[in-house]
């Protein structure tokens, strides 16, 4: 079972949602899966993209005409309608960005899984890793995560849709159904990003275990046969170190492909989540301030809080997963300098900077490989980027919290100043 076959259910779902334009074709002489170009899937994707763009533009013009007829509605209802419209537009823009990136970066998606296959072959041959068991475990974990995420989305959106169906107005059912469809596609795009990042982290964990088991020096009795075995073990350890270094080089290239495949989606999705969280918090503040403590008002406040939960969960999981994956490179560097060496051995003593001109190949190989691998870990650091605008890690959470707090303070101050001016004018 290769990685593509292990993730076949996910790819089938992404094909339906226009997030995977490749056709999965089994080769005639093996059990794997090949990626074949499908013009029908590409035509399907471009058709849905054009239709979604037209629907979004039509919704913008329709909303502008509706706002001209709603001068008589209250301030709180007007603000609530504006908040809903902002989130609807943000979700549709994120949906369009995901569809466009899936079509535009289809070659990068193919290169990602091709590079992943090369990494698995190196792990299987050079490091003797049971890649088959790793893929089976990955498929089980992916299925389990998909069930939990789908359950969370279903519960939150059913509560939101129920609250809006009970509200005043005849256009809410169509309004929210048109919102839920892009939301599910964006959620599936998030799951694609989670899965790709988890694939990278799984390979880094294998490298970390291999490096922790690496020993260049093992104590034993000074017997000729034992010394010969010791030299064989050291040579095997050097081969293992070279393999770890080569695999890390490919993992670094794999992360670069991941940033190409999903960078624009991460940028637009995180931006949309920021808008949704900020607008929902502002709307909840207004409801708390002006609600009459009726069951309907409480339901609206709870629905707004639940509405923010998927957006907050997506940003939280994405930031933590990317940050922990990037930290694996730092752990590799720490493990590299904890490799057991014998300073009395000339080949190992060369690690501190002394090289013998006339020596065996192993004597030169040890310091060169460790030193070069250390420099490689220093300069080829793993980072997940949202189209080059910002890095996705735990600092993103702090930035979003700070920006949300700042904008909420500004919006609340504007609202309170407008209320004060309105009350003064009514008093006069």
Swiss-Prot record:
InterPro entries: 7TM_chemorcpt. It is a multi-pass membrane protein. It is found in: Cell membrane. Its main location: membrane. It holds the Pfam family 7tm_7. Glycans are attached at residues 195, 345. Expressed in neurons of the terminal external chemosensory organ, the dorsal external chemosensory organ, as well as in the dorsal pharyngeal sense organ of larvae. Residues 62-145, 195-250, 322-349, 417-428 are extracellular. The chain crosses the membrane at residues 41-61, 146-166, 174-194, 251-271, 301-321, 350-370, 396-416. One of its GO terms (cellular component) is membrane. Residues 1-40, 167-173, 272-300, 371-395 are cytoplasmic. One of its GO terms (molecular function) is ligand-gated monoatomic ion channel activity. GO terms for biological process: chemosensory behavior; detection of chemical stimulus involved in sensory perception of taste; male courtship behavior; monoatomic ion transmembrane transport; sensory perception of taste. Keywords: Cell membrane, Glycoprotein, Membrane, Receptor, Transducer, Transmembrane, Transmembrane helix. Belongs to the insect chemoreceptor superfamily. Gustatory receptor (GR) family. Gr2a subfamily. Probable gustatory receptor which mediates acceptance or avoidance behavior, depending on its not yet determined substrates. This is Putative gustatory receptor 2a. It comes from Drosophila melanogaster (Fruit fly).
């Amino acid at each position: 079972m290769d990685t593509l076959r292990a993730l076949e259910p996910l790819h089938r779902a992404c094909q339906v949602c226009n997030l995977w334009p490749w056709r999965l074709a089994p080769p005639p002489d093996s059990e794997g899966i090949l990626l074949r170009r499908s013009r029908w899937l590409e035509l399907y994707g471009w058709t849905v993209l054009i239709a979604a763009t037209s629907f979004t533009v039509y919704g913008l013009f329709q909303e502008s005409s509706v706002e001209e007829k709603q001068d008589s509605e209250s301030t709180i209802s007007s603000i609530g309608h504006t908040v809903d419209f902002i989130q609807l537009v943000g979700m549709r823009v994120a949906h369009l960005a995901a569809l466009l990136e899936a079509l535009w970066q289809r070659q990068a998606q193919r290169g990602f899984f091709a590079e992943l296959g090369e990494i698995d072959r190196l792990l299987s041959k050079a490091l003797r890793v049971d890649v088959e068991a790793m893929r089976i475990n990955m498929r089980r974990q992916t299925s389990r995560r998909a069930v939990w995420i789908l359950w969370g989305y279903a519960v939150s959106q059913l509560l939101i849709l129920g609250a809006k169906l009970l509200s005043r107005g005849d256009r809410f059912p169509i309004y929210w159904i048109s919102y839920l469809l892009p939301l599910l596609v964006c959620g599936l795009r998030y799951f694609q990003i989670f899965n790709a990042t988890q694939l990278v982290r799984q390979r880094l964990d294998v490298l970390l275990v291999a490096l922790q088991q690496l020993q260049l020096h093992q104590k034993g009795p000074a017997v000729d046969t034992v010394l010969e075995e010791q030299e064989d073990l050291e040579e095997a350890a050097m081969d293992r170190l070279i393999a770890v270094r080569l695999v890390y080089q490919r993992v670094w290239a794999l992360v670069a492909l991941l940033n190409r495949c999903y960078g624009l989606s991460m940028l637009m999705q995180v931006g949309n989540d920021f808008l949704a969280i900020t607008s929902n918090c502002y709307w909840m503040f207004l409801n708390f301030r002006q609600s009459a403590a009726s069951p309907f008002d409480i339901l609206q406040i709870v629905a707004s809080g639940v509405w923010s939960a998927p957006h907050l969960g997506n940003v939280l999981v994405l930031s933590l997963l990317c940050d922990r994956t990037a930290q694996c490179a730092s752990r590799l560097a720490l493990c590299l300098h904890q490799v057991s060496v014998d300073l009395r051995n000339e080949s190992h003593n060369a690690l501190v900077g002394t090289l013998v001109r006339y020596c065996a190949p192993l004597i030169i190989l040890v310091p060169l490989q460790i030193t070069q691998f250390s420099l490689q870990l220093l300069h080829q650091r793993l980072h997940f980027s949202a189209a080059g605008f910002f890095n996705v890690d735990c600092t993103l959470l702090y930035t979003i919290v700070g920006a949300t707090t700042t904008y909420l303070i500004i919006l609340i101050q504007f609202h309170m100043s407008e209320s004060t001016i309105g009350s003064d004018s009514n008093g006069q």
